[in-house]
């Protein structure tokens, strides 16, 4: 372990004291924050030379961001347990038997969730809930089953204090799936996040319509292109956290992102960006990711000691890493401005789209050339990820999205631009569409949009009503009423509310074009 300066120690001590005295943090939030402060005092990774200049620097010069994973990673960032195995076999460590009815199934899940770690300290994947619960509701009184599932949803919202917790349903309709949609439409809570795996050949229209009505009420589910993800992951995938596609029974060691807009600022012109600045930053980024992965696998002891691995709920060789990026739109605009083409804007110009594709091809080729020995599930490569942004991002659009306020007037034109980029990102990308309240009377309109988009190989879509209290910030959900409370200095239950408030203030997320 490397030495650190007393200046850093004193800064950490001061931050700890401020955390203790905070009037807006709950006890649980203080405990988690104190752990992060303690982690900041460690220095155990062998960092590539030059990394800190673009990682730990002023925001306008930062080109690489590790999304607060800490200096000494003690577990993978995202963990995707095999819940079906848990239901089949139970767990010796947790002293839980395989469930025999809905009471036991829900109780077992509630116990299990408490013991699934992640970067947020809460589970980022809570299971394919429709198929998990469906066997137990077949012979039950439907209203009793509904009440139990509704209470289960409420319990998750009040105890999993982070809206990156994500459930999946679909693609086929089930009795449990319909009960879950009914419950979430009624509760209108931020947790859990929810995705419907949609396939036009497998998902009945009436089930999709039911899901759209739920989304208009509660901003969930989102909809993923099941056919596309199944191809990328040989059928065995989940959607976790925001909209992260990951292998079942595995997960992601780490997620580190490129800030493309700031990399573009370093470049003299397009050629300098593509041939010098971008490759240089990407090389630093992947070597940093390699070192984080090495430490988790070889030194942390997680896969040797955690019951999830010891009992076979996760497998080390089903983990990969997420090579993220933000700010493609701004990078394109900056590079075109350097060429005197101020009128060529991302989302409105064929040349801008073509430059965006050229940049993505460069990143994709670099990733394909890089190998990591511990990413067997993805053939030794990292998974590209269009990262959703963080609360402190200013004039940096998530992933490959068109900047808020610059969306094309015609939705079809926006979809056309997006269709050039979604295919690059097996570990997740997505776009958000606030929908006018009148669409509540015509959910078929949204279904038609979705069918057309998925036929164009878009990967992931989210819709929510423009008058809903629950809104989708980037990939996660927050209540506007909770953000208002936090803004007034009051404590709130979920830590993602603070992220949502920051995104509202810095990222203009409340100003998206309503469709």
What are these regions (language model features)?
Residues 127, 279, 325-326, 357:
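Non-catalytic, well-ordered alpha-helical scaffold segments
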Residues 355-367:
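Short amphipathic alpha-helical coiled-coil/interface segments
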Residues 124, 315-331:
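Conserved phosphate/anionic-ligand binding catalytic regions in large, soluble enzymes, centered on
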Residues 329, 349-353:
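Terminal accessory/anchoring regions of large secretory-pathway or extracellular enzymes
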């Amino acid at each position: 372990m490397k030495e650190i300066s007393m200046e850093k120690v004193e800064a950490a001590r001061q931050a700890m004291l401020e955390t203790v005295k905070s009037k807006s943090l709950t006890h649980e939030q203080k405990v988690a924050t104190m752990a992060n402060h303690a982690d900041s005092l460690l220095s155990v990774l062998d960092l590539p030379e030059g990394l800190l200049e673009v990682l730990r620097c002023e925001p306008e010069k930062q080109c690489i961001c590790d999304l607060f994973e800490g200096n000494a990673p003690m577990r993978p960032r995202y963990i995707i347990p095999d819940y079906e195995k848990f239901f089949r076999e139970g767990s010796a460590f947790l002293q839980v038997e395989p469930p025999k009815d809905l009471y036991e199934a829900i109780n077992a899940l509630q116990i299990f969730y408490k013991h699934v770690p992640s970067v947020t300290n809460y589970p980022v994947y809570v299971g394919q809930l429709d198929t998990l619960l469906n066997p137990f509701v077949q012979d039950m009184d439907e209203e009793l089953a509904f009440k139990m599932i509704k209470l289960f949803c409420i319990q998750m919202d009040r105890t999993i204090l982070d809206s990156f917790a994500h459930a999946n349903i679909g693609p086929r309709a089930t009795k449990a799936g319909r009960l879950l949609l009914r419950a979430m439409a009624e509760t209108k809570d931020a947790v859990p996040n929810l995705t419907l795996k949609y396939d036009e050949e497998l998902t009945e229209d009436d089930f999709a319509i039911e899901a759209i009505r739920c989304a208009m009420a509660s901003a969930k589910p989102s909809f993923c292109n099941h056919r596309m993800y199944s191809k990328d992951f040989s059928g065995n995938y989940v959607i976790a956290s925001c909209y992260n596609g990951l292998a079942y029974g595995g997960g992601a060691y780490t997620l580190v992102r490129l800030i493309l807009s700031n990399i573009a600022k370093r470049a003299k012109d397009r050629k300098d960006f593509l041939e010098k600045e971008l490759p240089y930053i990407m090389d630093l980024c992947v070597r940093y990711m390699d070192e984080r992965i090495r430490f988790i696998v070889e030194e942390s002891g997680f896969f040797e000691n955690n019951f999830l691995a010891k009992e076979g709920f996760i497998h080390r060789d089903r983990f990969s890493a997420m090579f993220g990026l933000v700010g493609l739109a701004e990078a394109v605009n900056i590079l075109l401005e350097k060429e005197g083409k101020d009128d060529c804007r991302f989302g409105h110009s064929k040349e801008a789209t073509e430059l965006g594709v050229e940049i993505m091809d460069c990143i994709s080729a670099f990733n394909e050339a890089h190998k990591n020995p511990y990413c067997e599930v993805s053939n030794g490569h990292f998974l590209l990820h269009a990262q959703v942004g963080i609360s402190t991002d200013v004039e940096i659009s998530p992933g490959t999205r068109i900047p808020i306020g610059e969306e094309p007037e015609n939705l079809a034109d926006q979809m056309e631009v997006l269709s050039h980029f979604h295919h690059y990102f097996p570990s997740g990308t997505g776009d958000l569409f606030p929908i006018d309240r009148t669409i509540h009377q015509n959910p078929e309109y949204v279904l038609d949009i979705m069918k057309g988009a998925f036929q164009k190989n878009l990967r992931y879509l989210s819709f929510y009503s423009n008058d809903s209290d629950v809104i989708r910030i980037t990939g996660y959900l927050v209540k506007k009423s909770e953000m208002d409370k936090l803004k007034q200095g009051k404590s709130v239950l979920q830590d993602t509310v603070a992220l949502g408030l920051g995104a509202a203030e810095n990222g203009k997320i409340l100003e998206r074009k309503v469709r």
